């Protein structure tokens, strides 16, 4: 009878090396698809399914859902009124996975995810309005933007950069298709504004970020009004913006009634928020720009105010605000006098100028280097130590 071999215990040195190995993250590689629900740390859709499996959680969520549908969304200046039974339902959800769940702007079923987020938002705060809590989780990608500037030789050498970025979009099948879709929806004497906005939202959500940013944030010479006009007309303002400027507070109230618009506005205020009078910004410029572009196609669509500068503003007014005049001007100024947004736009335009300058010989590498300025996509400092630990471990295990 053959006795089974008992596995020999690992020596202490091997166990120590195993403990030294850090957990390996799984960043999105160059060819990976857009983030899906499964890639999110705590998707609200997944959290909702977990809640449905628990009778107590499911009942509390349904009750809270009926509360949020019957209670109007409070504005920042208003004190929310929450019935006691709704507060009790919110309290029952505070230990569930729904608290802290997130969404992603490019995920499937995004609106359904945001509906869940804003339903449990009351449970997060127990009735206190939290304007600065973005429902979006940032997903880092390492995909570089590859482009061939030699294809622009068909343009005149002195063509403005907005025309060059428009050509780059035309040469890209996906960007060209999405741009034509909103161009058709937003043109004509009798355009349907809601259709135009929906196609604009689709473009800035699905087009590659460098293409979208290049089209909208292309730099122009100070005296080049034609370039400035092309840039300002990128979002087809004659159709996308309201013909008569509404009151800014009414525009915000309309935005808050839509989960998607509300989410984009909160995301913008989260990532473009000046922290102090010195203009210290809450997050890095790339996130501010991403949040800014996320507003295009919503009720809060901003745009450049003229053809001669890069100032942006909402298409609204503070006339008729009464006692809320100061609050209205603060909302308006968050776009027109926001140092974080202004500097983020200026920095991106400087980068776009460098892409086409003669002393920038490797455009593909330049884009990758610029993306790596974001600390979230830099190589992790433990990568060399991971290799140095793994090689001795393999050798020891082979000898053992």
Swiss-Prot record:
InterPro entries this protein is in?
GDNF/GAS1 (IPR016017), GDNF_alpha (IPR037193), GDNF_rcpt (IPR003438), GDNF_rcpt_A3 (IPR003505)
Entry-linked SUPFAM superfamilies: GDNF receptor-like (SSF110035)
- Glycosylation is annotated at 95, 148, 309
Q: Which tissues is this chain's protein expressed in?
A: Widely expressed in adult and fetus which exhibit a similar pattern. Essentially not expressed in the central nervous system, but highly expressed in several sensory and sympathetic ganglia of the peripheral nervous system. Moderate expression in many non-neuronal tissues, particularly those of the digestive and urogenital systems, but high expression in stomach and appendix. Several types of glandular tissues show low expression. Very low or no expression detected in the hematopoietic system.
Annotated signal sequence is 1-31
To which protein family does this belong? Answer: Belongs to the GDNFR family.
Q: What does this protein do?
A: Receptor for artemin (ARTN), a growth factor that supports the survival of sensory and sympathetic peripheral neurons. ARTN-binding leads to autophosphorylation and activation of the RET receptor.
Q: Please give the subunit comment from the record.
A: Interacts with ARTN ligand and RET: forms a 2:2:2 ternary complex composed of ARTN ligand, GFRA3 and RET receptor. Interacts with SORL1.
PANTHER family in alphabetical order: GDNF FAMILY RECEPTOR ALPHA-3 (PTHR10269:SF15), GDNF RECEPTOR ALPHA (PTHR10269)
Q: What is this protein's name?
A: GDNF family receptor alpha-3
Protein source organism: Homo sapiens
Coding gene? GFRA3
């Amino acid at each position: 009878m053959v006795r089974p071999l008992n596995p020999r215990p690992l020596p202490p040195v091997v166990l120590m090396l195993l403990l030294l190995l850090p957990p390996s993250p799984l960043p999105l590689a160059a060819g990976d698809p857009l983030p899906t629900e499964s890639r999110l740390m705590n998707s609200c859709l997944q959290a909702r399914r977990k809640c449905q499996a628990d009778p107590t959680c499911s009942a509390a969520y349904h009750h809270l859902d009926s509360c949020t549908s019957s209670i109007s969304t409070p504005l920042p200046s208003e004190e929310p009124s929450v019935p006691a039974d709704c507060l009790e339902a919110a309290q029952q959800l505070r230990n569930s996975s729904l608290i802290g769940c997130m969404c992603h702007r490019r995920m499937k079923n995004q609106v359904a995810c945001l509906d869940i987020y804003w339903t449990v938002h009351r449970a997060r705060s127990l009735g206190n309005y939290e304007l600065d809590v973005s429902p979006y989780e940032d997903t880092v990608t390492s995909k570089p933007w590859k482009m061939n500037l030699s294809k622009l030789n068909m343009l005149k050498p002195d063509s403005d950069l907005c025309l060059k970025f428009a050509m780059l979009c035309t040469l890209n099948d996906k960007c060209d298709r999405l741009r034509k879709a909103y161009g058709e929806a937003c043109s004509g004497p009798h355009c349907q504004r809601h259709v135009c906005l929906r196609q604009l939202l689709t473009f800035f959500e699905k087009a590659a970020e460098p293409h979208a940013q290049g089209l909208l944030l292309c730099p122009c010479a100070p005296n080049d009004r034609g370039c400035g006009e092309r840039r300002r007309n990128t979002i087809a303002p004659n159709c996308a913006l309201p013909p008569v400027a509404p009151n800014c507070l009414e525009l915000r109230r309309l935005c808050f009634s839509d989960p998607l618009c509300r989410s984009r506005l909160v995301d913008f205020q989260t990532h473009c928020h000046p922290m102090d009078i010195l203009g210290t910004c809450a997050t890095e410029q790339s996130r501010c720009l991403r949040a800014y572009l996320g507003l295009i196609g919503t009720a809060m669509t901003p745009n450049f105010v003229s053809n001669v500068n890069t100032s942006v503003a909402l298409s609204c007014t503070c006339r008729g605000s009464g006692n809320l005049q100061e609050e209205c001007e603060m909302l308006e100024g968050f776009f027109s006098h926001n140092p974080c947004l202004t500097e983020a736009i200026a920095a991106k335009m400087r980068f776009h100028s460098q892409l086409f300058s003669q002393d920038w010989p490797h455009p593909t590498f330049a884009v990758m280097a610029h993306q790596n300025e974001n600390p979230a996509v830099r190589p992790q400092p433990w990568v060399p130590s991971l290799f140095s630990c793994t090689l001795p471990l393999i050798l020891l295990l082979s000898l053992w």
